[in-house]
């Protein structure tokens, strides 16, 4: 009896010992696992000088083809694991989102330029959740539908500008600038050249340039401890932060004084807004107006595809003519009735991804995948360029084939990201892009531009460089499809003076 009681008393200690031994064994086993393979590295700099400044995502794809769907690239002292297949990205960034839903530490752009206030760069935690709740109130499905009255009005103005102007890149940018400034600040701006909008756009351009130079402090974090005299990026970044702060504060003050409804006023009613200070709230709301480039880049790719792939355009125009006819413009009520147009837009975003290099994620804890070790705190990036041209997922991936999305509705679209880090403004982007694309295809036929009888060729691989990547400027010909289409456009798009205040107040009434 005594022996049995002694043994029973020993059981809890034995269980703890076995658990500890198992944990140590598991950790040692995991530590013995290698990092994912990758190109040979040089001492100290790693692969820093093997990564080209132009189109680095193409180099990553070449490395994926050589080393596999998950590779390690070392920039200075920092390891980055790059994912090159849909399966790897879904397995880690979606299915294991709890471990990969954070962001790495962005020293230059995150800490210095944005003062730790940029939502998209924050690590997962309470602050990020507060930011996300505020932005979700602005851009969720329901609120985006409330904004359709504004998309409708501004898309008609866009058609008029293209009809009478000839250029399309600037009108596309004006369109998104007007929408986001009206919704956020209750301001009517004429477009990207408007002084109030230009200030934000110019500072974003500078930020993106600084971000592209951030490889030194990010690759060698120890340099962050240098005094300002030896780290000139710190002074530049501090000046940008001060410019940001003044600009966003001025816009917020003006928004609260403006008569019509705007989201700044709406945000102050949110409980989440009371959990951040005024400077932080200014940055959260200001980030909305910094997102004007992405939509215009998608529409630039859309026009390029229209010219280079006339057969695909004929298919979608036949669908539009069948559903809508020549007597009215397309509307949001038609969205569900235009599956080929929706497939066309999915293909536009796959064929030339505007975030080809993806956005960095970070691992919370040590992990194991495909027999490889992924250490805690590692930067993990989904290379959209590799994934969108993955032959195992997309047949003939370099071909522009919208019908692939009809044939297989389960094909993965990654344009807006992964997991909890999916773009909070995606519903606004989808709706505002859809209505413009539908109305452009209803209104115009598209062709190459000609100068002195010579066709102006378009290089579909000639894209801008940076965090976002859109087409380099090219010329195109827009021709009204028929006199009837012209008549409808004159009737529907002829009003030059929109009552933005009335539109915003109508949107605001839906929030009450």
Swiss-Prot record:
Top-rank lineage group of the source organism: Eukaryota
Listed PROSITE patterns: CYTOCHROME_P450, PROKAR_LIPOPROTEIN
Binding, heme: 423
The UniProt record lists the keyword Ribonucleoprotein: no
SUPFAM superfamilies for this protein: Cytochrome P450 (SSF48264)
Gene3D superfamilies reported in the protein's UniProt record: Cytochrome P450
A GO term, aspect molecular function: heme binding
Subcellular location per the Swiss-Prot or TrEMBL entry: Membrane
Known EC number: 1.-.-.-
Keyword terms, alphabetized: Heme, Iron, Membrane, Metal-binding, Monooxygenase, Oxidoreductase, Transmembrane, Transmembrane helix
Biological role: Cytochrome P450 monooxygenase; part of the gene cluster that mediates the biosynthesis of the alkaloid (-)-FR901483, a potent immunosuppressant that shows efficacy in animal models and a probable inhibitor of purine nucleotide biosynthesis by targeting phosphoribosylpyrophosphate amidotransferase (PPAT). The only unassigned enzyme in the cluster is the second cytochrome P450 monooxygenase FrzL. The biosynthesis of (-)-FR901483 starts with the condensation of two L-tyrosines to yield (S,S)-dityrosyl-piperazine.
Protein name as catalogued: Cytochrome P450 monooxygenase FrzL
Lineage: Eukaryota, Fungi, Dikarya, Ascomycota, Pezizomycotina
